[in-house]
Regions:
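Conserved SAM-binding loop
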Residues: 54-55
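Conserved SAM-binding loop of SAM-dependent methyltransferases across substrates and taxa
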Residues: 26-38
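A short acidic, Gly/Pro-enriched loop at the edge of an enzyme's catalytic core
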Residues: 73-88
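A short glycine-rich, Lys/Arg-flanked "PGG" loop and its adjoining helix->strand segment in the class I
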Residues: 100-121
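Short alpha-helix
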Residues: 153-171
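Conserved SAM/SAH-binding beta-strand->alpha-helix loop
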Residues: 47-49
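Conserved class I S-adenosyl-L-methionine
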Residues: 15-26, 123-148
Length: 197
């Protein structure tokens, strides 16, 4: 995340951005890299067990315990954000009743326009080459449906950039610039600066 923020600081005034961290968990991984550089920070986390830890790790942030996906899909958040970081799980997830309710960032990112005004920077994780992929048939099925491809175990950066540009454009936002940053062996940060058409 350090490289991502350094890249962004050369292009935008980070200190003027109202940021949102989605799937906050403890807030002790990459969130601390940018938390004190932005104008404001709101963190969304579904599990209340993380609330006090989040408050400790991110004392200046506004912590909200809620279902992030339900909140954006149903347009329940009145605030708009300029920097949105989606640190989603890399599989399907949900409730005990519906464990495969959501998948990666898919359900969230399709509704990103609900929390953006005129422009925003979106940072999200992409698993280009999932490992043990065949052991998770529901995850595989959801990826195939979202990306519109039969094989999603190896997605090229070229395909992914084109796919997300088209997805954002369909939602009324053009891509001003984008960049990929390696996070881990199979995981990259995708950074998109979006502007309303």
């Amino acid at each position: 995340m350090n490289a991502v923020i350094t890249f962004l600081e050369k292009r935008v005034d980070i200190a003027k951005l109202n940021a949102l961290e989605v799937f906050g968990r403890a807030g002790d991984w990459h969130t601390t890299v940018y938390a004190n550089r932005v104008k404001s920070l709101q963190v969304w986390e579904i599990d209340k067990k993380w609330k006090n830890i989040l408050k400790k790790n991110l004392p200046n942030a506004k912590i909200k315990i809620l279902d992030s996906i339900k909140t954006i899909v149903e347009n329940l958040e009145p605030s708009k954000f300029d920097l949105i970081v989606i640190d989603n799980p890399m599989t399907t997830f949900g409730t005990k009743k519906e464990p495969n309710l959501y998948c990666e960032h898919f359900d969230f990112i399709k509704n990103i326009g609900n929390i953006i005004d005129k422009e925003a920077i979106i940072i999200f994780n992409i698993n280009k080459n999932p490992f043990n992929y065949d052991e998770f048939p529901e995850w595989k099925k959801r990826r195939e449906k979202f990306y519109g491809r039969k094989r999603t175990s190896k997605l090229s950066p070229r395909f992914l950039i084109k796919f997300y540009k088209k997805l954002f454009l369909k939602n009324g936002y053009k891509t001003v610039f984008q960049k990929l940053f390696r996070r881990e062996e199979h995981l990259d940060y995708f950074v998109f600066f979006l502007r309303k058409n």
